[in-house]
């Protein structure tokens, strides 16, 4: 498969062979990037300093922006949840994130785009062009962190 590191030691971030059956591993890798050591399912991120989410704090194991919770829980869990209900429900967090990732993977055809959309709201090429970042890291670094986690999980899963 193409998930090997290249000679420069850089993490491979291109997954042409990614299959929808690996979406759970993709989700687990995302959880590791977003909240490892940071409080897991009840985590609250730092206050966003700029951009469309200014003043807000991402929540949960996957750092979901609160404004997305009502519509995403309605769509994927079957009932609208408040931020607090969402924080108290690890299963709802897993369901929402897995379905959002799958939806964006199906929409764009590449897992890298689905991960980029998660981080920036945009597919990879657009995010790179816009120099999208969360104030501390940009999308290439985020994708690289995700890839490292994903590759490790894929190895363990064999």
What are these regions (language model features)?
Residues 1-55, 67-95, 99-158:
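Non-catalytic cell-wall polysaccharide-engagement segments
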Residues 64:
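N-terminal carbohydrate-binding/catalytic regions of secreted carbohydrate-active enzymes
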Residues 61:
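Acceptor-substrate binding/catalytic loop of class I
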